[in-house]
Structures are given as C-alpha cells and as structure tokens.
Swiss-Prot record:
Compartment annotation: Cytoplasm
Domain of life: Bacteria
GO terms classed as biological process: 'de novo' AMP biosynthetic process; IMP metabolic process
Identification of the protein by name: Adenylosuccinate synthetase
Keyword annotations from UniProtKB, A to Z: Cytoplasm, GTP-binding, Ligase, Magnesium, Metal-binding, Nucleotide-binding, Purine biosynthesis
Residues that bind GTP: 13-19, 41-43, 306, 332-334, 415-417
Gene responsible for this protein: purA
Provenance organism: Cronobacter sakazakii (strain ATCC BAA-894)
GO cellular component annotations of the record: cytoplasm
Cofactor(s) it depends on: Mg(2+)
NCBIfam families: PRK01117.1 (NF002223), purA (TIGR00184)
InterPro entries xref list: Adenylosuccin_syn_GTP-bd, Adenylosuccin_syn_Lys_AS, Adenylosuccinate_synth_dom1, Adenylosuccinate_synth_dom2, Adenylosuccinate_synth_dom3, Adenylosuccinate_synthetase, P-loop_NTPase
Record-listed substrate binding positions: 300-306
EC identifiers of the protein: 6.3.4.4
Length: 432
C-alpha cells in the first residue's frame, strides 16, 4: 500500500491534474503543491459547479484535507488573497485548511513588471510566459536576493531588504527595458497589509510531512504544468522555471525521496501545448480545430487557445523515464469520440532520415522532426460519462491498450468527463 502519491503531468501541462487530485483526495489527509506558482490553472467540476484554482492546492474543497503550499512554490501574496476570498465567499473556510512554508519565495509587483517587459522585448522570439512574474521570482531565489514568506515576521528588516532588491530591479526596468519604475512604497504597503494573514498560516512543512508519514497518513503531492515544461528536462528554453518532474517533490516540499510510494502520470488522450516551443504532432487542419473546440482547449490561467495534436508517445516515454511512473490516468478520452481514425506518434523521423524513439534535449534539435504515426480505427459511440470499462467501445479499448504497450505503463484511471464522478478507477494509487 502506498501512503504517499504524486500526481503530475506527462505532457506540456493542461492534462487534467486538478480533477484527479480532487478525486483522490477523498482518502488523503494532506495535499501539497511543491513547485510553480499561480501560472497553474487547475479546473475542478463538482456537481456541475466549476472551480478554477491557480495557487491553492486542489484538496482545498475537502473538509478532511489540509492543503499545503511547499517551499518550491513561488507565492504571489496578491494572487493568494484573491483566491482565498473567492473561496471564502463560497463558504469554504480556507484559513482553517491551508498552510504555507516560510521558505516560499514571494512574487511581487516588480517580478510581474520584469516578466512583461522581457516578453515584449523578445518580440517574435517570446517564450509565451503567463506574464505573472514566475521566472523572475525563481531568478531572485537562485540569486539569493529573493524575499520569502518568512521575511514577513520581521517587518522592519523586510522593508530594508525590499528597498535593496527593488533598486536593483528598477535599474533594469528603467535603463534597459525603458519602462516605468515600480513604486517602493506601494509594494511595501500592499504586502504589509496582508503580512499577518500569511504568517499566521506558516508551519515547518518538512517536519509536518515527516510526522504525518510516521503516523501513516495519506499524502498527495500535486504537480503543476507538465514534464515537458520542466526547467531541466523540458524543451528548453520553452519551459517553465521550476522542476515539474517527480524529482521536484522532495526538493519542493522537504519530504525524503524514498518516501514517495506511487507516481501517477496524467496523460491526455491527445496532445496540447500553450505558448511557443516544439510540438511535433501539432495539427493545423480540421481535426486540430475539432480537438480544440470539443476539448475546450483554452487556458484556465490566461484564456489562450491551446495548440492541439495527436498523442505523442515518444514525448510521453521521456516522461515515463524521468518520473519513474507507476501508472497513468488517461483524460479527455471522450474528446476523440466521433473521429473515424485516431493516431499515436510512435517515433520521429529526423531531418537526416534517421528514425528515433527518444526526444531530443535541446529545442533547436526538434527542428524539422517528422512524426511517425500508427493509425487506428476511431469510434462513433459516446464515451462521455462512462463509468465502467465494459461500457467503452472496443475501438476505444484498443486505443487504451496500445497506449499502454507503446509507453510500458498501465492505465490505472480513465477520465471520461470533467466531473469527479465521471471517472473509472481501475487501480487506486493508494492501494497500489
């Protein structure tokens, strides 16, 4: 039996992690975010009511769950307070259910200003960030000049540190990017107004998780974005600024790596990507448009239209390697309903004619890749809301089986709709 389960994306994000975390937290005591920031967009549908979470873990809707934001997360105080208010207005007692690590780096106004200015300066070469200050906040962390939640306990020292770091960043903004400086007093006043709320939720996350583990409590670690956006293993530089892979769980929460029992990879039945970067199976035809519209492929955070394409098993196999996946959860199978045929990319043809079954590491090496497909019959029957494997069309079952064969990983959960009830749990990760 596995007490500690990781849920992460195996593609370029937007795989449907939030719903699955919410579903599985029925048995969890703790849900932990360990990387990313409010650039994530996790959509939950419960009894027809939609909730979109960006920063707060998806376990927050459960009264039996304590939600934790770990040290690997860059935390925007403004975004957190906005999200807390939205939930509290619906009667959810967020402050009773949410805890923070004091080591979370803070995202402040100057990080957002830098993010936006840089993307604008890149012009046609823009990475396609969410413009929410994520990258600049991680830069400050690595440069050891970042402000953290724990700094708010000493407000006078915080003010001094803020003045120093803001002078540094305003020099860049004014002299290099030719934009207005960020006002020191406004940033300070905004943070001080909510400092006590933030510090009241601070705990020693590593110790809390270790004590929970020793008691045998079930813990779930909720990933954001996807494996192929990992800062080290993704399609660099078209990546996010954190480790979205299983390795980020230990460093981003403080739990020991040996205590992770099961890693669940969320895999969409087709591929999507937001922003710039390599995407070998991208479709520019009517099928691509069909997938976008039927799958409602618009970002929960930015509203941007997602690029769509066939399932890329080559890219997913890289995610299997990096994350040592225990099993898959297949999502959005119902979006493929009605297609005469479905395709899986099983290899790449490189510009020099070679066939390869692993992904390149550098973004430039993806140029000119041609996907090699296996084509399978589609199905006309609806899979939407089907809750038993026996209720799926044979062609859909064949597609599922082939995914398992080409990736070497079993599909333990199948999602056939946005509601938590529209799910088949073939093997519960907490029982694996």
């Amino acid at each position: 039996m596995g007490n500690n389960v990781v849920v992460l994306g195996t593609q370029w994000g937007d795989e449907g992690k939030g719903k699955i975390v919410d579903l599985l937290t029925e048995r969890a005591k703790y849900v932990v975010r360990y990387q990313g920031g409010h650039n994530a967009g996790h959509t939950l549908v419960i009894n027809g009511e939609k909730t979109v979470l960006h920063l707060i873990p998806s376990g927050i809707l459960r009264d039996n769950v304590t939600s934790i934001i770990g040290n690997g997360v860059v935390l925007s105080p403004a975004a957190l307070m906005k999200e807390m208010k939205e939930l509290e207005d619906r009667g959810i007692p967020v402050r009773e259910r949410l805890l923070l690590s004091e080591a979370c780096p803070l995202i402040l106004d100057y990080h957002v200003a830098l993010d936006v200015a840089r993307e604008k300066a890149r012009g046609a070469k823009a990475i396609g960030t969410t413009g929410r200050g994520i990258g600049p906040a991680y830069e400050d962390k690595v440069a050891r000049r970042g402000l953290r939640v724990g700094d708010l306990f000493d407000k006078a020292t915080f003010a001094e540190k803020l003045k120093e770091v803001l002078e540094y960043h305003n020099f860049q903004l004014v002299n290099f990017y030719k934009v207005e400086a960020v006002d020191y007093q406004k940033v300070l006043d905004d943070v001080m107004a909510i400092a006590d709320v933030l510090t009241s939720m601070v705990v020693d996350v590593s110790d809390l998780l270790d004590q929970a583990r020793k008691r045998g409590d079930f813990i779930m670690f909720e990933g954001a974005q996807g494996t192929l956006l990992d800062i080290d293993h993704g399609t660099y530089p078209y990546v996010t600024s954190s480790n979205t892979t299983a390795g980020g769980v230990a460093t981003g929460s403080g739990i020991g790596p040996r205590y992770v029992d099961y890693v669940l990879g969320i895999i969409k039945a087709y591929s999507t990507r937001v922003g710039a970067g390599p995407f070998p199976t991208e479709l520019f035809d009517d099928i691509g448009e069909f997938l976008c519209k039927k799958g409602n492929e618009f970002g929960a955070t930015t509203g941007r239209r997602r690029r769509t394409g066939w399932l890329d098993a080559v890219a997913v196999r890289r995610a299997v390697q990096i994350n040592s996946l225990s099993g898959f959860c297949l999502t959005k199978l119902d979006v493929l309903d009605g297609l005469e045929e479905v395709k899986i990319c099983v290899a790449y043809r490189m510009p020099d004619g070679r066939e390869v079954t692993t992904t390149p590491m550098a973004a430039d090496d993806w140029e000119g890749i041609e996907p090699i497909y296996e084509t399978m019959p589609g199905w006309s029957e609806s899979t939407f809301g089907v809750k038993e494997r026996s209720g799926l069309p044979q062609a859909a079952l064949n597609y599922i089986k082939r995914i398992e064969e080409v990736t070497g990983v079993p599909i333990d959960i199948i999602s056939t709709g946005p509601d938590r009830t529209e799910t088949m749990i073939l093997r519960d990760p907490f029982d694996a």
